Amino acid sequence: MCEPRGHKDMVGALLVEPISKEADIGVIYMDANRWINMCGYATIGVSMTLVNENLVKVVEPVTHLILEMAAGLIHVDVEVEDGKTKSVSFENIPSFLFEENCLVNNIHFDISYSGSFFALVDADQLDIEININNANKFKELGVNLLRQINEKYDVKHPTLPINRVVNVEFYHKTDDGQKNIVISEEGIIDRSPCGTGTCAKLAYMYNTNKLKLNEIFINQRFTGVSFKGRVIEETKIDKYKAIIP
């Protein structure tokens, strides 16, 4: 992903023939270090590209797509005007709170799944402001924290071969939602508020009675870009109370 005009924080998408007959197209996500089960902001980008380049049948005002990826089938709605994308929303795979009130080195966090496992850390306990000047501090802290989490906690999806916490979201509460910075275990700083991470946060908030069904949650990256998310229904994954975000 670093050549010819890439960089270490970039996510790429390999478009392939789907296995599922329901899907319009298959997507294999990757970054500069590994394959990725699911990426929310890349799903938005792929869907925009498919519509804007007429790689799928475009229907106005909304083009419906089903993308198949390692995490499962993702249903996407692309709002279209004059043949171009205006906005993108997607229905993610079932997401759930795996474990709450975890602790490593006096840092409290919760673990949620939404295509990948995320550690969710309230940054108020760290006394570090979430801003661009502290990005490298969070990067170093995040990489070390994820290593220790995976050494201490036995994290396993009940039905899929996914068994690592690969991202950490540090967040502050704001007046209308939350502000965050997301770090991967390789030290990649997410360029967006993180779509998959937003779904993980929805699962945590819903299961801890901090968010209601269909209530809009605004998740903002430290640069000001924001995603909106909501819980559209409840479901269950093995023993876990899950949601469809």
State the predicted function of each range.
Residues G115:
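Glycine-rich ThDP/TPP pyrophosphate-binding loop and its adjacent helix/strand module
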Residues F118-A119:
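Glycine-rich phosphate-binding loop plus the immediately following alpha-helix
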